[in-house]
UniProtKB/Swiss-Prot annotation:
SUPFAM superfamilies: Nucleic acid-binding proteins. This is DUF35 domain-containing scaffold protein. PANTHER family: BLR3430 PROTEIN. Belongs to the scaffold protein DUF35 family. Zn(2+) binds at residues 25, 38, 41. The gene is acaC. Pfam families: OB_ChsH2_C, zf-ChsH2. Interacts with acetoacetyl-CoA thiolase and HMG-CoA synthase (HMGCS) that catalyzes the first and second step in the mevalonate pathway, respectively. Functions as a scaffold to connect the acetoacetyl-CoA thiolase and HMG-CoA synthase (HMGCS) dimers in the channeling thiolase/HMGCS complex, which allows for efficient coupling of the endergonic thiolase reaction with the exergonic HMGCS reaction. One of its GO terms (molecular function) is metal ion binding.
Length: 136
């Protein structure tokens, strides 16, 4: 099994993982994750931008042979989610059965356990997406 991410590095990325903090360049291009240079226009003037956490499933698959450390979760759905604001995020889907997943399904970001390291007890949390349940 690979070594866990250093705790200090994990905490540096805390806001991105829990609140979907990305970037917005001076020309209005939205980026996730935040980058030092806008890949669209080359601007270096990037400010923080908080995404709503809502979006739609573009496409998805079921991971049946996961990477080391994620065997406990198999099989699990992995999706490309287009956020309301435009950027596309690759993330696990949660709180949904595979037969219920549809392209265009509205989802929202939630914080969930991503991985647990038995050797030192470190638990990593991050974002996943779940279906938005519409009340009638």
């Amino acid at each position: 099994m690979g070594k866990p991410m250093q705790v200090s590095r994990y905490w540096r990325h805390f806001r991105e993982k829990y609140r979907l903090i990305g970037g917005k360049c001076e020309n209005g291009h939205l980026l996730f994750p935040k980058r030092p240079i806008c890949p669209i226009c080359g601007s270096r003037n990037i400010e923080e931008f908080q995404f709503s956490g809502k979006g739609k499933v573009i496409t998805w698959t079921i991971v049946r042979n996961p990477p080391s450390g994620f065997e406990y979760y198999k099989p699990y759905p992995l999706a490309l989610v287009q956020l309301e604001e435009g950027p596309v995020v690759l993330a696990q889907l949660t709180d949904v059965e595979p037969e219920e997943i549809k392209e265009g399904m509205e989802v929202e970001m939630v914080t969930r356990k991503i991985r647990e390291f038995d050797e030192d007890g470190l638990i990593l949390y991050g974002y996943k997406f779940r279906p938005i349940i519409k009340s009638e």
